[in-house]
Curated annotation (Swiss-Prot):
Upper taxonomic lineage: Eukaryota, Fungi, Dikarya, Ascomycota, Saccharomycotina
Gene Ontology cellular-component terms listed: cytoplasm; cytosol
Region span, Hydroxyethylthiazole kinase: 239-540
Residues that bind ATP: 365, 415
Details of cofactor binding: Binds 1 Mg(2+) ion per subunit.
Effect after changing residue 370 to K: In THI6-3; possesses TMP-PPASE activity only
Active site feature: 465
The protein's enzyme class: transferase
GO molecular function: ATP binding; hydroxyethylthiazole kinase activity; magnesium ion binding; thiamine-phosphate diphosphorylase activity
Species per Swiss-Prot/TrEMBL record: Saccharomyces cerevisiae (strain ATCC 204508 / S288c)
Record protein name field: Thiamine biosynthetic bifunctional enzyme
Gene from which this protein is expressed: THI6
InterPro entries in the record: Aldolase_TIM, Hyethyz_kinase, Ribokinase-like, ThiamineP_synth_sf, ThiamineP_synth_TenI, TMP_synthase
Subunit and interaction comment: Homooctamer.
Amino acid sequence: MVFTKEEVDYSLYLVTDSTMLPPGTTLCSQVEAGLKNGVTLVQIREKDIETKNFVAEALEVQKICKKYNVPLIINDRIDVAMAIDADGVHVGQDDMPIPMVRKLLGPSKILGWSVGKPSEVETLAKWGPDMVDYIGVGTLFPTSTKKNPKKSPMGPQGAIAILDALEEFKATWCRTVGIGGLHPDNIQRVLCQCVASNGKRSLDGISLVSDIMAAPDACAATKRLRGLLDATRYQFVECELNNTFPTTTSIQNVISQVSNNRPLVQHITNKVHQNFGANVTLALGSSPIMSEIESEVSELARIPNASLLLNTGSVAPIEMLKAAINAYNEVNRPITFDPVGYSATETRLCLNNTLLTYGQFACIKGNCSEILSLAKLNNHKMKGVDSSSGKTNIDTLVRATQIVAFQYRTVAVCTGEFDCVADGTFGGEYKLSSGTEGITAEDLPCVIIEDGPIPIMGDITASGCSLGSTIASFIGGLDSTGKLFDAVVGAVLLYKSAGKLASTRCQGSGSFHVELIDALYQLFHENKPEKWSASLKKFK
């Protein structure tokens, strides 16, 4: 059967591996189970097999693919593909050059190419639409199916760079499939986050091996994968993701929910912050726990209204941090991420980027320098972990906040004299191929919170970190009717107002510590946002 390029469905792309078959199954039985339940494209990948056996295997799989009207792709072996008249070939960067492959295959066959750099996209764009039909974008995450991986995992941000390059070089014809380390626990996050910066394209599909080939019940495994692709919504927290402009009434409702639910806030944070953060959390009607014990994170995450504040001011063991992120993501409990000193040192940059790649965060909160660096709008490396926005204007800070919110599908907070809060969750919605249909970072809803200068805030330790405690308390206390954006905005508004109130009462930096906790307690328990001193307005 001949498939036209336009009608190929890349959404669920199965790559075979005969070395991981469960007992009682065959390669053909696993492939057919996948095809029965939603696989849309099959690639035979065999690295250690005699040509005669490869051809025989390919012919058997081809019969099954024809039965389900699904294209068959051969990995690397152009001779095998031509011998059985397969529907196409997939090659890597070190395989036969693309122009030569196309010359051998002819114009009608599907030709795929593994791509991991924007420069490779530039090359395929120069070749034009007659060469590469689709690219495998990756490797996204670590994977055991590559015995000697030559590329480091790129994560969703690397995939975004590839999608941006396709748009920049106008390779509109080229389809994309995410490859490498994709499993049910990260597929929806990848589909949600991997959107070009101009909002005009997203991944066309995902490629998997072990989740079908190694599954004892490949039918059920494929149904689950198909369901994730078709869901079009990633509900990564148990509250509402739809945003409207916060009002005093909606913020009152948030505080009432926090007060009623008394969330448990697990702090993984720096030692300087721990005591002050615990007292701030208590002042907000919440229960703090300072725990960096890997073996208990799953239990803590499952406590009703649990919330995690992950602050990288002190570098905890990376495996413990990953375990915590995974535990909270697994049960859809919110994580507030504070990438302290994001790019201050290579160690911090590597740690923060690793964690950003590993999980989904309900809120990413940082000072001006951190958010500018995250958005790649900072021209210099941070000096230490303190904020140093200098003369950066409010338009640039808003833009940076919106970029972070857009790229990480989160509510982003940029702190300073003016606090910016942007919602990039898109209600958790995602679409294959079409991205956000042209909606970009600068289109995201963003609010500005200000209360004049409060210089004494910078004269105490952990004032910025404790805003993280406040946000984590508010979003952890939401029930299913609460709105994430309202909670984050309400937390920032309360904290700013409490800071101003405390600054009028204190005698110096020592008493400011105490007055800030008292002010937070007072404003939270009074629950009268209409009387708070900080102002809230939409940006433009």
